[in-house]
């Protein structure tokens, strides 16, 4: 589980609820079922109208990515690439065929399979980058979905406010109810703002971050696979791939190699 996402939502909602509780009216005035209906159902309906059904059905999956802790094991991948490079330099590319079953990453395995099969370097580069591009297009569907929802929620919040104001103006003779009616009219705007800025935008940004990290790992794999095919020195390959690591991961890689 990604504790940062859970803590972020918990602290955010907690801060809002505590702030509401300390108002003179308490929490009760901030709850209105019709406002929830307009904001949540209205924005979701518009989202469905503007998106593919397949994408909308995957909302639970996208939320799962938001709460999941993502680990890409870059150090382990680099170590495997260096080991494969060393073996290829000593025994030839065909000797790597026996090592393919030990590679768990499908993208990594398909790239090495192309190398062992003797595919042209440009063909390998094109195929792997095409697969990377398609992956990013799939990821973009999810982030764009929540980006759209973040735009729609405040709009429907304002719609609810306008509905409330129309109802308020239609009942001006009851002056004792003006204050409470105005409060109810504004609640939908509050709901829309909370949904957009605390719920949907963080999910969108997290999905974009996951896409960036995964694309970086796959780019690293592509460069490593092509270097193995071209017969680069394993130490040069290692130094090149270390540029994809953070200083902390570089230290981990150096210590693991030094301990072997």
From Swiss-Prot:
Keyword Oxidoreductase set for record: no
Summary of the function given for this chain in its UniProt record: MotA and MotB comprise the stator element of the flagellar motor complex. Required for rotation of the flagellar motor. Probable transmembrane proton channel.
Domain of life: Bacteria
Source organism of the structure: Borreliella burgdorferi (strain ATCC 35210 / DSM 4680 / CIP 102532 / B31) (Borrelia burgdorferi)
Topology within the bilayer: Multi-pass membrane protein
Major location category of this protein: membrane
Protein name, as recorded: Motility protein A
Residue spans crossing the bilayer: 3-23, 27-47, 152-172, 183-203
Subcellular location: Cell inner membrane
One cellular-component annotation, GO: plasma membrane
Ranges of the Cytoplasmic topological domain: 204-260
Pfam families, A to Z: MotA_ExbB (PF01618)
Tagged with keyword Kinase: no
Gene: motA
Quaternary context: Each stator complex is composed of 4 MotA and 2 MotB subunits. 2 A subunits and 1 B subunit are thought to form a single ion channel, so that each stator complex contains two channels.
UniProt similarity note: Belongs to the MotA family.
Keywords recorded for this protein, A-Z: Cell inner membrane, Cell membrane, Chemotaxis, Flagellar rotation, Hydrogen ion transport, Ion transport, Membrane, Transmembrane, Transmembrane helix, Transport
InterPro entries: Flag_MotA_CS (IPR000540), MotA-like (IPR047055), MotA_ExbB_proton_chnl (IPR002898)
């Amino acid at each position: 589980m990604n504790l940062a996402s859970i803590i972020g939502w918990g602290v955010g909602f907690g801060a809002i609820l505590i702030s509401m509780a300390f108002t003179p009216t308490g929490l009760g005035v901030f709850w209105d079922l019709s406002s929830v209906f307009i904001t949540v159902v209205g924005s979701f309906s518009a989202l469905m109208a503007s998106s593919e059904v397949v994408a909308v059905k995957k909302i639970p999956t996208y939320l799962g990515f938001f709460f999941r802790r993502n680990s890409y094991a870059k150090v382990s991948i680099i170590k495997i690439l260096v080991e494969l490079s060393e073996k290829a330099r000593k025994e030839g590319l065909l000797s790597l065929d026996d090592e393919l079953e030990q590679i768990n990453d499908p993208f990594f395995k398909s790239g090495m399979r192309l190398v062992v099969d003797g595919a042209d370097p440009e063909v390998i580069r094109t195929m792997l980058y095409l697969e990377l591009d398609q992956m990013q297009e799939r990821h973009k569907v999810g982030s764009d979905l929540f980006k759209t929802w973040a735009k729609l929620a405040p709009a429907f919040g304002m719609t609810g406010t306008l509905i409330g104001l129309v109802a308020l103006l239609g009942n001006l003779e009851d002056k004792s109810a003006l204050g409470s009616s105005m409060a109810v009219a504004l609640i939908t705007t509050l709901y829309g703002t909370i949904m957009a800025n605390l719920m949907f935008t963080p999910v969108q940004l997290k999905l974009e971050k996951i896409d960036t990290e995964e694309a970086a790992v796959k780019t690293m794999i592509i460069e490593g696979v092509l270097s193995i095919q071209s017969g680069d020195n394993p130490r040069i390959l290692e130094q090149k791939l270390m540029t994809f690591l953070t200083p902390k991961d570089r230290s981990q890689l150096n210590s693991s190699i030094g301990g072997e």
